[in-house]
């Protein structure tokens, strides 16, 4: 095997591999002999077809199938012999059988960027200090009280706090919008789920009343169908129900769960759950801040194909989130081209961060052990009610173990960095603040 390596760019190498005729021709002959025993051509008995006819009819097929095998069998040996460290699958750009009987293929591969690792220990990170206010607990209990309330139909105009059943149809420039229509829609007046302007129009309306209402929605409205648009609504009230709220006493707490004997126990449980959720959210924030701090000062080039792959994964995630709301990219006013443009810098930083973490893992000899894998399998099993064996079988059947191991390795490296970091307490924040930061970073 003859191997030549050429530098195409700082991070791309062209690997030219030539296999001698002595290695190639016996395999070609073996392929033809196998076909000779199997194929059936009119005018010849099976196994008696002349070799020249076999070659004439099947040359392209044999060479195509064999070239794929020859590349697969020799590519990894070639890059290993040359000491290359590919970080992407090869792009096979040239495959040819030479006149002397040899075989040549050219592979373009992306290699790991070379950079100096700076300081990664003792990073100063602000640790979110979480706290649960009594007002938050009272608000949650009030929401429980509201949900548990009995609903009674009333013959009067609707007021805040009522539940109104309404049919509505939205129009834009006189055309009915199929996605802005609902029958028997339950509107909780004052909750704000339908928007203040929409709910304000229903206040004062009674069963059987109809009304027209125009609303201009802001550009930052969460519903991508109506954001930034002026919509004309036709409303029809079907009925009005008022809530009969239960007293907030020990009996209410008992109705909330068998484990509660008093209102104090219910409040203690809510506080513990909220603190746990805040702490979990804070962990994500700390990891994000660690990565941000770690990346400061690094601008080394990363392989464009890895950035493109990361961008594709981000777009898939966006598509999945939209699908959960019954939307497509087009319906949301987005396109893959636009998202690629918006995501490229974030994707490059993620790829850069991954290279940084892997270099730290090499220096610190951090590896994924069997017990790390088992913990990872158990964590997923707990989420989806599966056994460790079932989770393991799932990953093996999909050939997804390597991405999973990479995720576990990154978690382990981040845990190491956190153990070496200097944590500075931040002011106490509410759950929404911590969760918002974790989602945005």
UniProtKB/Swiss-Prot annotation:
GO terms under cellular component: cytoplasm
UniProt superkingdom: Bacteria
Subcellular location: Cytoplasm
Entry annotated with the keyword Chaperone: yes
Record-annotated PPIase FKBP-type domain positions: 161-246
Catalysis: reaction(s): [protein]-peptidylproline (omega=180) = [protein]-peptidylproline (omega=0)
UniProt keyword Oxidoreductase present: no
Pfam families xref list: FKBP_C (PF00254), Trigger_C (PF05698), Trigger_N (PF05697)
GO molecular function: peptidyl-prolyl cis-trans isomerase activity; protein folding chaperone; ribosome binding
InterPro entries: PPIase_dom_sf (IPR046357), PPIase_FKBP_dom (IPR001179), Trig_fac (IPR005215), Trigger_fac_C (IPR008880), Trigger_fac_C_sf (IPR037041), Trigger_fac_ribosome-bd_bac (IPR008881), Trigger_fac_ribosome-bd_sf (IPR036611), Trigger_fact/SurA_dom_sf (IPR027304)
Keywords assigned by UniProt, alphabetized: Cell cycle, Cell division, Chaperone, Cytoplasm, Isomerase, Rotamase
Domain notes: Consists of 3 domains; the N-terminus binds the ribosome, the middle domain has PPIase activity, while the C-terminus has intrinsic chaperone activity on its own.
Described function: Involved in protein export. Acts as a chaperone by maintaining the newly synthesized protein in an open conformation. Functions as a peptidyl-prolyl cis-trans isomerase.
Descriptive protein name: Trigger factor
Gene from which the chain derives: tig
């Amino acid at each position: 095997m003859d191997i030549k390596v050429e530098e195409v760019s700082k991070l791309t190498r062209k690997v030219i591999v030539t296999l001698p005729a002595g290695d190639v021709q016996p395999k070609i002959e073996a392929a033809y002999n196998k076909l000779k025993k199997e194929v059936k051509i009119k005018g010849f008995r099976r196994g008696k077809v002349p070799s020249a006819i076999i070659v004439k009819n099947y040359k392209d097929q044999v060479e195509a199938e064999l070239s794929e095998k020859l590349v697969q069998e020799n590519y990894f040996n070639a890059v290993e012999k040359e000491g290359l460290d590919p970080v992407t699958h090869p792009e096979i750009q040239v495959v040819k059988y030479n006149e002397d009987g040899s075989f040549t293929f050219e592979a373009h591969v992306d290699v790991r960027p070379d950079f100096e690792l700076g300081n990664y220990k003792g990073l100063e990170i602000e640790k979110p200090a979480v706290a649960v206010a009594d007002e938050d607990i009272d608000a949650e209990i009030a929401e429980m009280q509201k949900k548990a309330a009995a609903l009674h139909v009333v013959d009067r105009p609707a007021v805040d706090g009522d539940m109104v059943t309404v049919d509505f149809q939205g129009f834009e420039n006189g055309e009915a919008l199929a996605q802005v229509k609902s029958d028997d829609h339950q509107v909780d007046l004052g909750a704000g789920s339908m928007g203040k302007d929409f709910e304000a129009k229903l206040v004062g309306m009674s069963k059987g009343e109809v009304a027209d209402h125009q609303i201009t929605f802001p550009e930052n409205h969460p519903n991508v169908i109506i954001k930034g648009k002026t919509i004309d609504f036709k409303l029809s009230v079907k009925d009005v129900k008022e809530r009969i709220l239960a007293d907030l006493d020990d009996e209410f707490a008992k109705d909330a769960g068998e484990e509660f004997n008093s209102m104090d126990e219910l409040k203690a449980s809510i506080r513990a759950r909220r603190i746990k959720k805040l702490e979990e959210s804070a962990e994500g924030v700390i990891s994000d801040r660690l990565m941000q701090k770690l990346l400061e000062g690094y601008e080394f080039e990363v392989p464009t194909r890895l950035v493109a792959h990361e961008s594709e994964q981000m777009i898939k995630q966006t598509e999945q989130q939209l699908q959960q709301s019954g939307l497509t990219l087009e319906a949301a006013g987005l396109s893959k081209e636009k998202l690629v443009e918006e995501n490229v810098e974030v994707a490059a930083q993620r790829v850069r961060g991954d290279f940084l973490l892997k270099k730290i893992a090499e220096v610190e000899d951090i590896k994924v052990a069997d017990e790390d894998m088992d913990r990872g399998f158990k964590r997923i099993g707990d989420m989806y009610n599966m056994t460790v064996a079932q989770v393991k079988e799932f990953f093996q059947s999909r050939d997804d173990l390597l991405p999973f191991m990479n995720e576990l390795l990154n978690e382990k490296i981040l845990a190491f960095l956190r153990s070496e970091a200097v944590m500075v307490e931040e002011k106490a924040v509410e759950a929404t603040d911590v969760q918002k930061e974790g989602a945005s970073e």
